[in-house]
Amino acid sequence: PLTILATGGKSYPGTGSDGSGYALAAAVGHTIIPPRPSLVPIICENTDKQFTTLMGLSLRNVTLNLIQKKTGKVIYSELGEMLFTHFGISGPLALTASSYMDVPTDYRITIDCKPGLTPEQLDARMLRDFEGSPNRAFGNALEALLPHSLIPVVVAKSGIPAERRVNPLTRE
């Protein structure tokens, strides 16, 4: 017969959850499955200084994708809410995604801020917005689409100067 021995984890020694139950189980011959963090915020290794400007930004109705670096396989993808913190990301999406991670450095995360739109629909929406205000600067033209604190990061990642007028911009 199989035996499940529930002795708590080892995440909070102050409460008695110090991992001693694993040693007890191993001593009597049980196979131990190494524990790993689950339902925890995700610490992001990111050298991009702009990332820290997002601290405190809460996003709703976004899709978080957890992608295995080696294979490019999407391990987790869900629509919901998340929060940028001083160390990475938190909130319901991040907490759930963390339970899918074996070795944290083996993954990358993407966030789709407009999951209800296909890439083609997003292109069309942006071009339509740009045509409506052709003399607006690129950075300002994104205000209808993104939270204010996210705009400088998106502008920097796009390679398009924030002050460039949107009238000559195309899908390319």
Regions found by a protein language model. Give the residues of each.
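Short hydrophobic core segments
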Residues: 1-17, 25-26, 82-87
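An anion/pyrophosphate-binding glycine-rich loop and adjacent beta-alpha core
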Residues: 30-36, 40-169
